[in-house]
């Protein structure tokens, strides 16, 4: 059974593509028809592609991998943040800083600065420093949280990227491709699907459409995590049972 229904996709307006004059011919296979100068996406293909992306991210999660959610356009910012947090993943929803993946060592120094400023405040330094300096530190902190808060706990490269609008996030995609990090993307009719490993043909401009699909990808990750935890529990239970059996055997021998 599909993880998403045609009804859900229709209600969220996932089928509305861009104007026919603003299209990428490579998306032709995902287009159903044209209506009033707008391309209509083939939702049967979207259903199948959502399944593929879902299963991939579920597997990444089962294997203990992490996913970086990227969506800096206004329609995606809130969904990307809330769904990444819900799934315990990382996100960038303001601006992609150049080298975020390819020069992570430098970026990680800036992330470290977040903790440094927090410690300064905890240690009471804000109370003894000049007021002007404290104001500047708070501004710096707010700026760092705004742009890097979503990856402050990211200690290594993500195992996958989930991207809303590849055209908008072309820098993120270029860096991920350079590092061979698989990409799942919501791809509208004006985008190049060849840059994306797991294409989800869909409207990337409607908030409801973006939220629905982003939530589904978060669900996949959560399901994968559940699989991991279930296996761990089962393994622990087997160990406990083995120990119990050994203990019972020892007691029987002693008797």
Curated annotation (Swiss-Prot):
Domain of life the protein comes from: Bacteria
Positions of region (Disordered): 226-255
GO terms classed as biological process: translation
Record's GO cellular component terms: cytosolic small ribosomal subunit
Gene3D superfamilies the record matches: Glucose-6-phosphate isomerase like protein, domain 1 (3.40.50.10490), Helix hairpin bin (1.10.287.610)
GO molecular function: structural constituent of ribosome
UniProt entry keywords in alphabetical sequence: Ribonucleoprotein, Ribosomal protein
Keyword rRNA-binding included in the entry's annotation: no
Pfam family, one: Ribosomal_S2
Xref: PROSITE patterns: RIBOSOMAL_S2_1 (PS00962), RIBOSOMAL_S2_2 (PS00963)
Alphabetized CDD domains for the sequence: RPS2 (cd01425)
Similarity annotation: Belongs to the universal ribosomal protein uS2 family.
Protein's name in the database: Small ribosomal subunit protein uS2
Organism field: Staphylococcus aureus (strain JH9)
Phylogenetic placement of the source organism: Bacteria, Bacillati, Bacillota, Bacilli, Bacillales
Name of the gene encoding the protein in the UniProt record: rpsB
